[in-house]
Amino acid sequence: MFSNRLPPPKHSQGRVSTALSSDRVEPAILTDQIAKNVKLDDFIPKRQSNFELSVPLPTKAEIQECTARTKSYIQRLVNAKLANSNNRASSRYVTETHQAPANLLLNNSHHIEVVSKQMDPLLPRFVGKKARKVVAPTENDEVVPVLHMDGSNDRGEADPNEWKIPAAVSNWKNPNGYTVALERRVGKALDNENNTINDGFMKLSEALENADKKARQEIRSKMELKRLAMEQEMLAKESKLKELSQRARYHNGTPQTGAIVKPKKQTSTVARLKELAYSQGRDVSEKIILGAAKRSEQPDLQYDSRFFTRGANASAKRHEDQVYDNPLFVQQDIESIYKTNYEKLDEAVNVKSEGASGSHGPIQFTKAESDDKSDNYGA
């Protein structure tokens, strides 16, 4: 069955197919006849059943005939489209006149040719039209029953009462503040003399209380045992440490009375330097010793030293390639004249070698004191 939106099919000669006519044979009638004549072998390709089958090619005459027939059909379609596009029967002429002042002698009228708008001959047929969709009615549609209430849809006061669900009433708490009727209260059943309290409630409460006491007692006993075990462990550690300390004292030969032995007082660096100088037979003043023992700390300079080193040569003309006015390490060379070598000084103090010198530079002499008191070394 073909779609109703497509043009009816035609034969190669241009005749309309009779398959869509009203007197066509229904497919349901021919179904049985087609099924009887069709076999399974008809669906098998011929080359598969017979590999040596030779299919002859079309002759030149047949090819030329098919080409001419196709070319003539296409030419007829093109000529029909061009004939419609070249149709100028709808054209007409219109005379238009403009209004101008009377003193101007001008020809204000001119002719206009009105022609209908040219349409594209290759546009599809259904542009701008809605697709006409035909829906065939279904067969054997069952009638859907309509369910509704008898009478009007207005609800009365009786309808909510029928669907109302009462709230749950608790015997222990009333968070929403509901009013409980007397017949639904728990204490209402106690008024009846026939009802008696079961002894099981009293036994249950006593059993729970005894179990609670027993559990508390077990926890208390466990904590006590744990505390005693920790105390015994601490005592064992202390006794072991005491034993180790006694063994160390015995091996070292120290008295076991427990008296604290004070270490020997270490001599200062100044005293050691004075002793070394006395042993070498040199007279060195305390000022030199103190200067060697205590290194002078110079703060970092926060200014450019070149401002103070040029002096009288500030106005002297220098060479254009001379960037700096002084050598790079001139200040370091000046300081190294009277600078003390601390590494060699430490070696001399510790090793007490005979040929080691404690300082570099000239020896500074101080005035002798008038007191007759002499130091320990006779200096």
UniProtKB/Swiss-Prot annotation:
A cellular-component GO term for this protein: Prp19 complex
Comp. bias intervals (Pro residues): 1-10
Predominant location category: nucleus
Location(s) in or outside the cell: Nucleus
Keywords, alphabetical: mRNA processing, mRNA splicing, Nucleus, Spliceosome
Basic and acidic residues bias (residue ranges): 368-379
Residues that span the membrane, as ranges: none
Residue ranges, annotated region (Disordered): 1-22, 353-379
InterPro entries: SKI-int_prot_SKIP, SKI-int_prot_SKIP_SNW-dom
Chain's role: Involved in pre-mRNA splicing. Associated with the spliceosome throughout the splicing reactions, until after the second catalytic step.
Family: Belongs to the SNW family.
Other comments on record: Present with 1670 molecules/cell in log phase SD medium.
Subunit structure: Belongs to the CWC complex (or CEF1-associated complex), a spliceosome sub-complex reminiscent of a late-stage spliceosome composed of the U2, U5 and U6 snRNAs and at least BUD13, BUD31, BRR2, CDC40, CEF1, CLF1, CUS1, CWC2, CWC15, CWC21, CWC22, CWC23, CWC24, CWC25, CWC27, ECM2, HSH155, IST3, ISY1, LEA1, MSL1, NTC20, PRP8, PRP9, PRP11, PRP19, PRP21, PRP22, PRP45, PRP46, SLU7, SMB1, SMD1, SMD2, SMD3, SMX2, SMX3, SNT309, SNU114, SPP2, SYF1, SYF2, RSE1 and YJU2. Interacts with CLF1, PRP22 and PRP46. Interacts with SPP382.
Protein name in the entry: Pre-mRNA-processing protein 45
